[in-house]
């Protein structure tokens, strides 16, 4: 074996001082000295358990010892009598075996492929051992789950990702999906449970046994977000539910994830065979599927954006030419041809590479280079993680860990290791780009067009010198353009830009100036773009993005020219520049029913336990989607109603994710309220009022929300830290408000206003559904009933949603005195106008002035409250356009008036959207919209002025 390098020999003296009693420097073998110097994890472990070191010194780990893991664990669990002792034994066993694997890996006693197998077998052994012990315990407590024929039902566990592929890294999360075969009930227990409840409780206990940190550490971080519907879906699904989901709703990325899916503890019984057969058609298509390339290209772009977003330098997994790109290369062939070529259906990467070579899908030399690069990168990754049992793929910056890795990788020193790594990653990147790369390049014509602007940029030409290229501009615009360029150059002198940044900027600016200055509005556009550039000049990756992708630069210029709001957003949040890379998605917002799924996929890249990154990711997703909606709005591909629909669906997806995150955090701390043991759902609802409730959000709208629960009195939570159930829901609502309003580097998520709750700011933040109903019936003012017209549940389980809808319908269909209602609605409108009146009397406030949007909303609300007791169908919708439609359909308002009000309403809202894109206030000249205003005022007089 390789002797320790000089830096590590020096560090050995520090190790000696920490050796457990009974071990001396002279009593240890060279092997022990090497491992304990290399890995702090191994050193800490043998200090706590000196017998492990003696065991390793007497008999080295063997390549095939994974075959004994199940037997060893069975012995360890033989005396376990409760969940606490189970958790202790699982953690003890995992640490002991991980030390053995670290020993074998550091000393190269077994090859790197075997190390990956051992790590995967260990995880599988622990998962299956914990499941089987807990299944038996749950059966003793609640009976055995059976189908209607009385056949016992098992819990099947799909290991995803590297666990499924038998390629787990040293310190890794495990991605799991739980399933059970058939519906039914438990038999033989103290009381019957349906199978869904049984397996959900079993799944929760299994996750806790593996994932929960204790004084002994944890076994594995368990990630369940790959299951159907992610965190918002059931924890465990029946086979039928799984099949329905993957047939009807399975996404491309879920198909890729399923390639590596493997049943944990698969004994090839009938249930296992059924599940495998059910999933196979979803993963491997019978035809050759070339759509995969674009889907994987999109995923590649997502990862590239992630690297930029998080500043992931020196990342051997996600960086260019890293492990993820090798995985993508292999998946391309699996997903295109796997349905026709069984040899490509392997879950493991290296056997699939062999199949790719055998089928001549890649040149032999490329396959050989990919194999060498993969084994090199995986060894480097595992060594890096085994130093501290830490989940990282980023190369270290300190000298000690660099010396450790250089020695472990058999390099003379760190520079030599980096050189070898660079060569391997360059080979991977080359093959990757040839296969699915889509980098753009300048054409000779573009170079020729930008050449005169190189002089303008680099030589700081005076006005006379630059006249030919700016001749099409007016004198004032020409002077302004040159001043902007000169001021920008002065600003750059104050910034710490490195040589690479200067070089990229000098490549970029001639192209940018050529495009901007060919426009009639060159001065305005350049004035919006230079602040953005000033903000990113020290972040070379963004300059490179604009320089290397001319299409992205063109879209940047077009959008900044069209909207100062977009320019401001891009300047404030440069990561949004990534959205400019794909015009196919930039001007085509996410489908209205797909926001939740896209957000779920986006959040999967962020560790579930990292709250800070989760908050950032939520904000970044929202900003990216807002940009796409605004771009489509500017391009004219989205009418005003659709703009608001998209903004509303986006907000609902964000609400869903925030509630999920808050719920997860609260349940981890307190458990869940015990009344939920007897029912599905969370007993919690979020009601949207105002623009959210009415599907009418604008670009900068806040969210009017109230929170409801159905928790009975005297219910406690079932966690280790018990609290009152209603207190749980109050803290949940407070947590939700916190997650929305916390300001991160990406800003806040939404401004949230909860003052529409019963008793307003003086009332409880969260209200029971019964108390809400009582308040609405006996205490609420007329204006609160008006607000209820535009209210709907935006998050909640079906039971609470139905309860709220019943309350809303009951209130709205209550018979009212027409004159009294007319007076109260009119007086409320007059109060609003006095309080929020237009301060610019020479301007028309589109929302607040007479004949504006609010008048139309009040007309609709008044008519619903006035006539819904006769025409209950008026309560169906919460948005003004469909309410006006209902009023016409039910004979309350004639069709011509309803249509005219609808046109006026959408016209005024369209103008508000476009003013927002221009960062202008919501008022216009008094002469504007005179026809619409006159029509609205006439309708107001007809319905709301007493006769």
UniProtKB/Swiss-Prot annotation:
GO terms for molecular function: [glutamate-ammonia-ligase] adenylyltransferase activity; [glutamine synthetase]-adenylyl-L-tyrosine phosphorylase activity; ATP binding; magnesium ion binding. Residues 1-440 are annotated as: Adenylyl removase. Its EC number is 2.7.7.89, 2.7.7.42. GO terms for biological process: regulation of glutamine family amino acid metabolic process. It is an enzyme of class 2 (transferase). Its cofactor is Mg(2+). InterPro entries: GlnE (IPR023057), GlnE_rpt_dom (IPR005190), NT_sf (IPR043519), PII_UdlTrfase/GS_AdlTrfase (IPR013546). Residues 450-947 are annotated as: Adenylyl transferase. It comes from the Bacteria. It catalyses: [glutamine synthetase]-O(4)-(5'-adenylyl)-L-tyrosine + phosphate = [glutamine synthetase]-L-tyrosine + ADP; [glutamine synthetase]-L-tyrosine + ATP = [glutamine synthetase]-O(4)-(5'-adenylyl)-L-tyrosine + diphosphate. Pfam families: GlnD_UR_UTase, GlnE. Keywords: ATP-binding, Magnesium, Multifunctional enzyme, Nucleotide-binding, Nucleotidyltransferase, Transferase. GO terms for cellular component: cytosol. Involved in the regulation of glutamine synthetase GlnA, a key enzyme in the process to assimilate ammonia. When cellular nitrogen levels are high, the C-terminal adenylyl transferase (AT) inactivates GlnA by covalent transfer of an adenylyl group from ATP to specific tyrosine residue of GlnA, thus reducing its activity. Conversely, when nitrogen levels are low, the N-terminal adenylyl removase (AR) activates GlnA by removing the adenylyl group by phosphorolysis, increasing its activity. Belongs to the GlnE family. This is Bifunctional glutamine synthetase adenylyltransferase/adenylyl-removing enzyme.
């Amino acid at each position: 074996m390789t002797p320790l390098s000089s830096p590590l020999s020096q560090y050995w003296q520090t190790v000696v001082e920490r050796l457990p009693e009974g071990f001396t420097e002279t009593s240890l073998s060279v092997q022990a000295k090497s491992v304990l110097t290399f890995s702090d994890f191994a050193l800490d472990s043998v200090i706590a358990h000196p017998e492990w070191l003696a065991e390793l010194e007497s008999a080295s780990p063997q390549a095939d010892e994974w075959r004994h893991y199940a037997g060893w664990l069975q012995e360890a669990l033989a005396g376990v009598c409760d969940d606490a002792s189970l958790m202790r034994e699982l953690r003890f066993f995992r640490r002991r075996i991980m030390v053995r694997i670290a020993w074998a890996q550091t000393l190269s006693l077994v090859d790197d492929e075997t190390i990956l197998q051992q790590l995967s077998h260990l995880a599988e052994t622990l998962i299956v051992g914990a499941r089987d012990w807990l299944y038996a315990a749950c059966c003793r407590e609640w009976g055995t789950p059976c189908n209607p024929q009385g056949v016992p039902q098992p819990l099947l566990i799909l290991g995803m990702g590297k666990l499924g592929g038998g390629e787990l890294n040293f310190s890794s999360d495990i991605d799991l999906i739980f399933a059970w075969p058939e519906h039914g009930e438990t038999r033989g227990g103290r009381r019957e449970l349906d199978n869904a409840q049984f397996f959900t409780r079993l799944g929760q206990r299994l996750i806790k046994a593996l994932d929960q940190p204790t004084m002994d550490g944890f076994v594995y971080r368990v990630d369940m977000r790959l299951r159907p519907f992610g965190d918002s879906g059931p924890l465990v699904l029946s086979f039928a539910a799984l099949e329905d989901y993957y047939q009807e709703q399975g996404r491309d990325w879920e198909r890729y994830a399923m390639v590596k899916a493997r049943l944990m503890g698969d004994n090839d019984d009938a249930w296992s065979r059924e599940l495998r057969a059910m999933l196979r058609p979803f993963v491997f298509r019978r035809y050759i599927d070339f759509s995969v390339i674009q889907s994987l290209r999109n995923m590649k772009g997502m990862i590239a954006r992630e690297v930029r977003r998080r500043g992931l330098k020196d990342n051997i997994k996600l960086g260019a030419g890293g492990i993820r790109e090798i995985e993508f290369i292999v998946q391309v062939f699996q997903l295109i041809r796997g349905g026709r070529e069984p040899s490509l259906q392997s879950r493991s990467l290296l056997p699939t590479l062999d199949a790719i070579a055998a089928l001549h899908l890649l040149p032999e030399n490329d396959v050989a280079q990919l194999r060498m690069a993969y084994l090199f990168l995986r060894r480097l990754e595992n060594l890096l993680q085994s130093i501290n049992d830490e989940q990282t793929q980023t190369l270290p910056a300190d000298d000690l860990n660099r010396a450790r890795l250089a020695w472990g990788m058999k390099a003379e020193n760190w520079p030599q290791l980096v050189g070898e790594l660079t060569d391997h990653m360059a080979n991977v990147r080359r093959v990757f780009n040839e296969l699915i790369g889509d980098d753009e390049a300048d054409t000779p014509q573009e170079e020729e067009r930008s050449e005169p602007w190189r002089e303008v940029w680099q030589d700081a030409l005076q006005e006379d010198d630059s006249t030919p290229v700016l001749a099409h501009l007016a004198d004032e615009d020409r002077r302004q353009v040159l001043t902007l360029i000169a001021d920008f150059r002065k600003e750059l002198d104050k910034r710490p830009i490195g040589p690479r940044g200067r070089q990229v900027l000098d490549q970029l600016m001639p192209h940018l100036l050529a495009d901007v200055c060919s426009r009639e509005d060159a001065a305005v556009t350049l004035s919006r773009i230079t602040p953005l550039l000033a903000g990113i000049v020290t972040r070379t990756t963004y300059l490179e993005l604009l320089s290397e992708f001319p299409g992205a630069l063109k879209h940047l210029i077009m959008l900044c020219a069209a909207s100062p709001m977009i320019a401001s957003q891009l300047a404030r949040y440069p990561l949004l520049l990534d959205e400019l890379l794909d015009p196919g998605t930039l001007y085509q917002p996410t489908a209205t029913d797909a926001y939740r799924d896209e957000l779920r996929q986006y959040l999967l890249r962020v560790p579930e336990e990292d709250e800070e990154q989760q908050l950032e990711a939520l904000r970044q997703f929202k900003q990216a989607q807002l940009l796409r909606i605004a771009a489509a709005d500017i391009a004219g591909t989205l009418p005003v109603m659709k703009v608001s629909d998209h903004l509303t669906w986006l907000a609902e997806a964000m609400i869903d994710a925030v509630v999920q995150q808050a719920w997860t955090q609260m349940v981890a701390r307190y458990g869940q309220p015990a009344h939920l043991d007897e029912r599905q759902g969370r007993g919690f609802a979020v009601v949207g009022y105002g623009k959210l409730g009415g599907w009418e959000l604008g670009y900068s709208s806040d969210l009017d929300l109230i929170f409801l629960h159905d928790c009975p009195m005297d219910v406690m939570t079932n966690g280790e830290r018990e609290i009152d159930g209603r207190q749980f829901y109050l803290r949940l609502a407070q947590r939700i408000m916190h997650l929305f309003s916390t300001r991160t580097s990406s800003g806040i998520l939404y401004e949230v206003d909860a003052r529409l709750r019963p008793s307003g700011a003086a009332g409880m933040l969260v209200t029971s559904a019964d108390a809400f109903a009582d308040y609405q019936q006996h205490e609420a003012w007329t204006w609160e009933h008006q607000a209820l017209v535009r209210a709907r549940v935006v998050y909640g389980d079906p039971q609470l949603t139905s309860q709220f809808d019943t309350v809303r319908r009951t209130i709205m269909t209550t018979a009212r005195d027409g004159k009294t209602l007319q007076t109260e609605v009119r007086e409320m409108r007059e109060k609003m106008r006095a309080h929020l009146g237009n301060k610019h009397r020479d301007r028309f406030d589109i929302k607040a002035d007479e004949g504006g949007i609010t008048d139309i909303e009040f007309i609709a609300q008044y008519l619903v409250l006035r006539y819904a007791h006769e025409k209950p169908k008026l309560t169906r919708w919460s948005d003004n356009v469909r309410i006006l439609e209902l009023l016409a359909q039910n004979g309350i308002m004639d069709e011509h008036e309803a249509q005219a009000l609808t046109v006026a309403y959408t016209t005024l809202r369209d103008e508000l959207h476009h003013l927002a894109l221009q960062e202008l206030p919501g008022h216009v000249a008094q002469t504007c919209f005179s026809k619409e205003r006159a029509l609205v005022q006439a309708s107001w007089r007809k319905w709301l002025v007493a006769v």
